[in-house]
From Swiss-Prot:
EC numbers, comma separated: 6.1.1.3
GO BP, one annotated term: threonyl-tRNA aminoacylation
Catalytic reactions of this protein: tRNA(Thr) + L-threonine + ATP = L-threonyl-tRNA(Thr) + AMP + diphosphate + H(+)
Protein name: Threonine--tRNA ligase
Compartments (UniProt record): Cytoplasm
One annotated Gene Ontology cellular component of this protein: cytosol
UniProt GO molecular function: ATP binding; metal ion binding; threonine-tRNA ligase activity; tRNA binding
Gene that encodes the chain: thrS
Superkingdom, natural source: Bacteria
Disulfide bonds listed in the record: none
Keywords: Aminoacyl-tRNA synthetase, ATP-binding, Cytoplasm, Ligase, Metal-binding, Nucleotide-binding, Protein biosynthesis, RNA-binding, tRNA-binding, Zinc
């Protein structure tokens, strides 16, 4: 007689084993109709799975995040159902859930076209609208293998042979005549899967191994209702307009080419923004009392072996050799910073020691994962490492948190999601050390009134971690900032200080990044602002245009004056109509367009308009310079009089 405890604390007693769907029906027909799955004692289960003992139960509907993920997974099976009807010879590989959607990798000789994708989507909708039940069967490993062998599904057989124990009992999900294998859970009925869209086709190697066969990957998105789907598609359209690769080319900020995959060729205007970002962070370092250092780009393999990176990270490291010595180009800055710390005797009076670097790092990312500035092989980290005592951890972490929020707010990012990853099963140190470390991070977050989500077991083996994920104007999540405690690396690399009692102690090391990769953060900013950078960041802040040749000398005097004032300015003296010039510089997203005619020259004025077409009227040159200086010094996100 199981007793089911619901989230509100109420209890329901049943005379026999019940499913989540049974419990939902006992509560009411509306909930039964909405029920997708259940969370039983913290574990997601299919709505049909029986609960035989007392349990805590949360009923999952499409209003829950887990419910949407489940219906996305079921849409992947629906896609498989439709594919097998249209191309029965297809071999199905894997179909997981991804952010905002799903994909399915298939082996099909016929190369799918956009017309095929549209036909597939239509067939999927036809199938879903029949509202058929999804039937789950738990079978033996051998029965599952026999089922897929009879259907010629070689990839499913490979998964069973290579990834699933022979004493396991896999779950088979039957979509009418189509059968798939999955951990689940899945929707009980296809009425939940009617708001989706197939998005694109790409190539993907089986198991991600380039030595294996290339499969076709079909991407889709799925949502709980029509409105959510429409909102997402609108956001995707806006994201396409804001694509940093497209805008980067339009504004001549940077380029990338085949001879240097994942490496950025910065052009003048892009490098101007990069340097402004660097200057901004450098001022923050000074404000928060950091030393700035510079370590070598390349170090001997021996050091990477001592740090542990060679064992755990060597596949992602670029290497070279000279004079019978093997070197690695650094993928991160931390081992180099420990070497700097180790130069000279350190006392407890020297701690905390905050060491920062704009470190040029390289990682051998797979070529298929490279994506503009967002995923590169060569990048610059705004990396810092704080060497401190156990007692100083909370205060130092608190200062890091303040620095993160102070920095993000400058760029207009206010929606920050914070996660705290705690001790994993495999870890160094005793429980007392982890208790102190985790509590210090929690107290630092609470002291700053930061709400956070715990991720139990997700910390690194050498210490707990705080992650900061910012949400942009399209509500996309970008994980940028981290604060990571490290109780291992200082010890491995022999970092010590003399404690107050004259004993030698190992410092705690705090890894801290704010922007993460400057390249990636700049890509985020390009998309956030759609290339319309705030004045302080804009590569060109002012362009001055003449109406006739009579004003040419005066225009050049104005630009010289602006440059002496530290304002990034240029002139346009081309023999073109003023309307043409204005349109061109508006497309270049220059914040301020200044026009000079005879009257402006006579009165030592400029006619000011913004890139948004707002006419700010005539201003004396000095008045405009004062206003724009104030805007730059405040790092305002808005233009004058907006």
């Amino acid at each position: 007689m199981p007793v089911i405890t619901l989230p509100d604390g109420s209890k329901r007693e049943f005379a026999h084993a019940v499913s989540t769907l049974d419990v939902a029906a006992d509560i009411g027909p509306g909930l039964a109709k909405a029920c997708i799955a259940g969370r039983v004692n913290g574990e997601l289960k299919d709505a049909c799975d029986l609960i035989e003992t007392d349990a805590e139960l949360s009923i999952i509907t499409a209003k829950d995040e887990e419910g949407v993920e489940i219906l996305r997974h079921s849409c992947a099976h629906l896609l498989g159902h439709a594919i097998k009807q249209m191309w029965p010879e297809t071999k199905m590989a894997i179909g997981p859930v991804i952010d905002n959607g799903f994909y399915y990798d298939i082996d099909l000789e016929h190369k799918l076209t956009q017309d095929d994708i549209e036909a597939l989507e239509k067939r999927m909708l036809q199938l879903a609208k029949t509202n058929y039940d999804v039937v789950k069967r738990v079978v033996s490993w051998q029965e599952a293998r026999d089922t897929f062998a009879a259907r010629g599904e070689e990839y499913k057989i490979a998964i069973l042979d290579e990834n699933i124990s022979k004493d396991a009992t896999p779950a088979l999900y039957h979509h009418e005549e189509y059968t798939d294998m999955c951990r689940g859970p899945h929707v009980p009925n296809m009425r939940f899967c009617q708001h989706f869209k197939l998005m694109s086709i790409a190539g993907a190697y089986w198991r991600g191994n380039s030595e294996n066969k290339m499969l076709q990957r079909i991407y889709g998105t799925a949502w709980a209702d029509k409105k959510a789907l429409s909102t997402h598609l609108t956001r995707l359209e806006e994201a396409a307009k804001r694509d940093h690769r497209k805008i980067g080319k339009q504004l001549d900020l940077y380029h990338m080419q085949e001879e240097a995959p994942g490496m950025v060729f910065w052009h003048n205007d892009g490098w101007s923004i990069f340097l402004e970002l660097e200057r901004f962070i450098r001022r923050k370092l000074n404000q928060y009392t950091y030393q700035e250092v510079k370590g070598p780009l390349m170090m001997d393999r021996v050091l990477w072996e001592r740090s542990g990176h060679w064992d755990k990270y060597s596949e992602a490291m670029f290497t070279t050799s000279s004079e019978n010595r093997e070197y690695a180009i650094k993928p991160m800055n931390c081992p180099g910073h420990v070497q700097i710390f180790n130069q000279g005797l350190k006392s407890y009076r020297d701690l905390p020691l905050r060491m920062a670097e704009f470190g040029c790092c390289h990682r051998n990312e797979p070529s298929g994962s490279l994506h503009g500035l967002m995923r590169v092989r060569g990048f610059t980290q705004d990396d810092a490492h704080i060497f401190c005592t156990d007692d100083q951890v909370q205060e130092e972490v608190s200062a890091c948190i303040q620095m993160v929020y102070d920095t993000y707010s400058t760029f207009g990012f206010e929606n920050i999601v914070v996660k705290l990853s705690t001790r994993p099963e495999k870890r160094i140190g005793d429980d007392a050390m982890w208790d102190r470390a985790e509590e210090a991070l929690k107290q630092a977050l609470r002291a700053n009134n930061i709400e956070f989500t715990l991720l139990p077991g997700e910390g690194a083996f050498y210490g707990p971690k705080i992650e900061f994920t910012l949400h942009d104007c399209l509500d996309r999540a970008w994980q940028c900032g981290t604060v990571q405690l490290d109780y291992a690396l200082p010890n491995r690399l022999g970092a010590t200080y003399v404690a107050e009692d004259n004993s030698r102690q190992t410092p705690v090391m705090i890894h801290r990044a704010i922007l993460g990769s400057l390249e990636r953060f700049l890509g985020i900013l390009i998309e956030e602002y759609a290339g319309r950078f705030p004045t302080w960041l804009a590569p060109m802040q002012v362009v001055v245009m003449n109406i006739t040749d009579k004003q040419a000398d005066y225009v050049q005097e104005i630009v010289k004056f602006f440059k002496e004032q530290g304002i990034r300015a240029s002139f346009d003296l081309r023999n073109e109509k003023i309307g043409f010039k204005i349109r061109e510089h508006t497309l270049r997203r220059v914040p301020y367009l200044l026009v000079v005619g005879d009257q402006e020259m006579e009165n030592k004025e400029v006619a000011v308009r913004t890139r948004d077409g707002i006419d700010l009227g005539k201003m004396r040159l000095e008045d405009f310079a004062t206003k724009i200086h104030q805007q730059i010094s405040l790092r305002s996100l808005k233009l004058l009089e907006e």
